[in-house]
Amino acid sequence: MNKITCICLGVRSMERSIHFYRDKLGFKTDCKENNPRVCFFDTPGTKFELFPLDLLAKDISADNPPVIGNGFGGITLAYNVDRKEKVDEVFELVRNAGGNIVKEPQNVFWGGYHAYFTDLDGYYWEVAWGPNFKYDENGFLKF
């Protein structure tokens, strides 16, 4: 078990979240309706899924669903880019889309350039560029 095939985010409003990711940030999906039961986005190598938060909690355990909260859960999602300037470009897109800027783009101790934002449900995203980031022929990050 050494591959992540799908990342699922439980969201409070499918319509609002689909609009944010599909229409504002440009994620590709076959979701035609704005309030489906589930929505998958195509990202290279991994599916990205939105699912209603309350239904996701019940799917995990109908008898004892996890408590839904607003706190930081110790996980971030990341989008790594191939040019330093792209971090600023992505953050302008996020800002215009209504994302919450948590940390403005800045140089970081390891020689890179990064920033953080949260989406409409409070999930943390890092956008980062590194001088030593290398990508394969499919655009996948190699370390």
Which residues does each predicted region cover?
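Vicinal oxygen chelate
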Residues: 4-12, 39-42, 62-143
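N-terminal beta-strand motif that seeds the catalytic metal site of vicinal oxygen chelate
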Residues: 1-18, 74-79, 131-143
